[in-house]
Amino acid sequence: MVLLSLALAVPARAAPSSADEEIDGCLACHGQQDLSMTLASGETAPLFMKSELLAGSVHKSLRCTDCHAGLDEVPHPARQYQSLVQFRASFGEACKTCHFDNYTKTLDSLHYALQARGDLFAPTCVKCHGSHGIARPAEPRSRISQTCATCHATISQAYAKSVHGRALIEQNNQDVPVCTDCHRSHDIAGPRNRAWLMSTPNLCGRCHADPQRMKKYGLSTAVLSTYLADFHGVTASFGGQGTRPTERVVALCFDCHGIHDIGKVSGTAAAVFRANLVKTCQKCHRGASANFPAAWLSHYEPSLTRTPLVYLVKLFYTLIIPFIVLGLILQILLHLWRTVTNR
């Protein structure tokens, strides 16, 4: 291992009295574009920092040593790094000092599991949020998807073409979900995590069951309630597990509508368009005939105009069942009265 020194050929200076004074002192060296060091791998690690990045950062009021702890002395004490990847991966350790709650959430995430296995390319705080030019997470929200695209390029391309992605990118529509709305920010679960998979109907329902939001687009808000009431949702409520631990025998939202490539529900190209629906059903129901989808009422409550027969049958049972129950209760009470009077 090669011992790397960050020592700079400048005389020792007195401790700065303010954050601005400390930043100016650090920029005396780190404002030089050619400042760098050579790592054990032979790679060059740049040590230059653009002052304008920090000026527009949410951390602009912090001292440099709030994040770069132990480097308040000049010359700096020696540090050891094997490669540029390891050098960059080490930056995120400073974040937990202030953001401990979010740091503890990452310990349950798929990203941290990759780090724990020694994957130096796994996402860290700095890889997602940046190092010096740190913006507020939601300004603008489209930055979130762009950040995730650094590693998930193929998925990002599919999202950009989806009904959600196009609304965000082309119209700056703030109603649509970005990556973190579905996958969370710090405690990100893997795509095969069973608990997360089975929670996706409620996840989609956070937006699609919102009356104010769906009213803007003329979409039904009964998507979650109708799903939970039909055969797919009932199976999901029991866990939807097959005979093997990894087997799933129930259709969830993304099985029909897509995962990242979610399209409009209207139009002849839609997966849930009546003419295409049989192909969607055949993903699970092999051998399903052309009239198989007719058994599904879509995400709409039965009505006299859309499904009159189903609506009338439901109305009949809604009215008759209370009378049957009341009749049974009356019969029991009469039997009790007869028993008492005959004694």
Predicted regions and their residues:
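Short sequence/structural segments immediately N-terminal
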Residues: P11-R343
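Bacterial N-terminal signal peptides
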Residues: M1-A9
